Amino acid sequence: MPDPLDPSDSSTGLPSDDQVLELLAPEFSRSGVEIESVVVSDGGVAGRPSRIAVVVDSDTPVDLDAVAGLSRTASALLDEADTGWQAYELEITTPGVDRPLTTVAHFRRAHLRLAQIRLTNGEDLLGRIGITHDDGVQVVLRKPIKGTGWTVRDLAFSDIESAVVQVEFNTPNPQELNLAGAAETGGGA
């Protein structure tokens, strides 16, 4: 495991992705967030600053105040561990809406959201993410006959090739939300 205080572990004058993760993960976890990814990039081009970008997520929405608090925490921890690193910009952010859903946690956090899903058999679905289980997820789909009514389909994660949350501008149908488990979890539009 890299030593977060050993500058010889980094050839760029910056901490490595793993060093940043090791430094921040325990404190971020205590704050109820999970680090999704860390990217440390050297500015490369003259005048362009180096950057440490940390993407965080949680089972509850991460608001701007929480991001600001995490940024202060990360800054303090990185400053304390700094052994002569070059200057960098620190960015703490949450995943964008276009992040692919690739883990059980991603599907759980996308509960009640509309998603475009491609199955391994090539079938494309547009449905609302329902209750997530260890091995799969329920998806509420509009019935194909005249597009009226809803049906719930259980999908195994092994059958999902890709899934991405879609931006919605209209309020979801209450019946659709209930079928997706809104009543069970206290969610809704």
Curated annotation (Swiss-Prot):
The keyword Amino-acid biosynthesis does not apply. One of its GO terms (biological process) is ribosomal small subunit assembly. The keyword Cytoplasm applies. Keywords: Cytoplasm, Ribosome biogenesis. It is found in: Cytoplasm. InterPro entries: Ribosome_maturation_RimP, RimP_N, RimP_N_sf. GO terms for cellular component: cytosol. NCBIfam families: PRK00092.2-2 (NF000930). Required for maturation of 30S ribosomal subunits. Belongs to the RimP family. This is Ribosome maturation factor RimP.
